[in-house]
Amino acid sequence: MKREAFSPSASSTGAGTPLIELAGITRSFRNGEIETRVLHGIDLTIYPGEFVAIVGASGSGKSTLMNILGCLDRPSSGTYRFMGEDVAGFDRDELARLRREAFGFVFQSYNLLGGASARENVEVPAVYSGMPPAERHARAEQLLASLGLGERSHHRPSQLSGGQQQRVSIARALMNGGRIILADEPTGALDSRSGEEVMKLLRQLSAEGHTIILITHAREVAEMAQRIIEIRDGHIVADPGPSKPQGPEPDFAPHVDRTSSMSDLVEATRTALRALRANLFRSALTLLGIVIGVASVIAMLAIGDGAKAKVVDQISAMGTNLLTVRPGAPNQRGRETTATLVIEDVRAIAELPNVLASVPEQSASVTLRADNTDQRTTANATSWNYGVARNWPVASGTFFSAEDEARYATVAVLGQTTAGALFPGVDPIGQYVLVNNIPFQVIGVMSPKGATPWGQDQDDIVFVPFTTGSLRVTGQRYLRNVTVAVEDVSRIDATQNEVSQLLLARHGVEDFQIRNMASVIDTVSATQNTLTILLGTVAAISLLVGGIGVMNIMLVSVTERTREIGIRMATGARMKNILQQFLIEALVVSALGGLIGVAVGLGTAAVIALFDTPIKYSLLPVVLAFGCAFATGLVFGYLPARKAARLDPVVALASE
């Protein structure tokens, strides 16, 4: 059966009920095989409102006793009852609640957060108790003003004197009510005047009904208390006994109302930013790892996607609705010179359903001459509907017609590269060129096509009618290939099968090959995707290294800020509060690095694009890169955060 949660702020003691009861308390420490007992069977009872001084020399066990009284440490044996409730059964979070709602600590070394202002230091217990921001700001200001520090609420501890820092510590102890003030050598680091002021404050708080437990080695300081308990070698050697209160205990607990999780996150984020500002150079180096990782992912994927888009566009420009029939059986060498395709095959293919155009092609390397200029290029003998099939219009003039083919006209259409080489700065339309010393009249110039994905200049070409070319230019009867344009691209595979069956029936043997441009695009896209993934993986490794850097720095931060963690635990921070704080610090680093990395990655890609490198931006890589950076912070920040949350309060407070 689950025990009902104990709430010290919701409980009150009767006039005759002890506030604290210790019975047979011992505390031992083990170092290897050696066990040292510091406390021996401590019996102690403290009632509400008492001003108790525990006095003893160094090593007497008084600080260990204070740690147990303040629930910073657990006894090795014995019973500790707080308001009748056995503290031994409390878990870490319940002990944190007890410290938060019942105890206020005043330390000899002040134990203030160096990067926070006086007001922010005072507010720490209220942050963990869930007091709304406006209310805790007002209460902190009121407490500081009552202690004479109203004008120094925004000063950091380094800007305050020792006495002022101790008053800030007292104000912090009172923030959540300060039902019990545990003061460990509160005057030890102060001059005599400041020490007297602190003791005056403690006597005043005692008069107001606060229970004061003073730990000191100085007899003259202890004399200011109502009850002096002497401890020596872990034993209580003198105790006049408790004084029962004459009336009910005052209510010290301020109004606390749980704030939303969003408010907790905002406060944790503010604390994280303050911690990062405290070590700007180190934070910048940590950010750099994430920035490089995110920027690399975005830039490399943009380059990979750009290269893929360029290749696909180039292939698409050749026609996505095309089938190319070539002579020669599959895997046959030298199929370019194999004589299997004839013009009758072209006419038969044109009769098939879903065929928009069936275009014969022959080619030969020729020399063109215009005036005194020679140009070595490729002559393509084809039909009048070549431009329709290839989706390649003329830029000027016209393409030859079916009538030109029928009458074996000696007309030519030049590619952009060829036209520019033969007729620089001159309109070639109507001019004559010699194709292997045969005069052809230029009737058109094709629009620019650019290079193929394999680097071949498609504009370095001359087109002539098929009939004329096969008779006077190539001297061939057989075709180099047949280009088949389909009407419905969704049925291109079915049309390919029909063309294959037709040619197989006509030839009686599979002496041809059919290439589907849509399949080529799919293959090239798959290859480019693989390369893009490879680039992204290499970049992701950079992000992984950045994440390891975050974990390394956070582990160092936990080590450096162990004392701060102890202070926060002493003021009531739960394990989840510490875990949340350091996890958010890692996430803030990763998120900032991710945002900067996105900007750097996009900027890098833009600069690379200036050098004619194809770049393609898309939202998905940006989201993935930032998401991975955030996830990296979460994953690699968890271990340091968990380490921080599991620290022992006493060990953490004792660290330097």
From Swiss-Prot:
Domain (ABC transporter) ranges: 20-258
Single GO cellular component term: plasma membrane
Topology term for the membrane: Multi-pass membrane protein
Gene Ontology molecular function: ATP binding; ATP hydrolysis activity; transmembrane transporter activity
Transmembrane segment boundaries: 284-304, 531-551, 591-611, 619-639
One Pfam family, short name: ABC_tran
Binding of ATP, residues: G56, A57, S58, G59, S60, G61, K62, S63
S-adenosyl-L-methionine listed as a keyword: no
Keywords: Antibiotic resistance, ATP-binding, Cell inner membrane, Cell membrane, Membrane, Nucleotide-binding, Translocase, Transmembrane, Transmembrane helix, Transport
Matching PROSITE patterns: ABC_TRANSPORTER_1, ABC_TRANSPORTER_2, MACB
Enzyme Commission number(s) of this protein: 7.6.2.-
Domain of life, per lineage: Bacteria
Protein's cellular compartments: Cell inner membrane
GO BP term (any one): response to antibiotic
Function: Non-canonical ABC transporter that contains transmembrane domains (TMD), which form a pore in the inner membrane, and an ATP-binding domain (NBD), which is responsible for energy generation. Confers resistance against macrolides.
Subunit details: Homodimer.
Similarity-based family: Belongs to the ABC transporter superfamily. Macrolide exporter (TC 3.A.1.122) family.
Name under which the protein is recorded: Macrolide export ATP-binding/permease protein MacB
Natural source organism: Azoarcus sp. (strain BH72)
Lineage: Bacteria, Pseudomonadati, Pseudomonadota, Betaproteobacteria, Rhodocyclales
Gene: macB
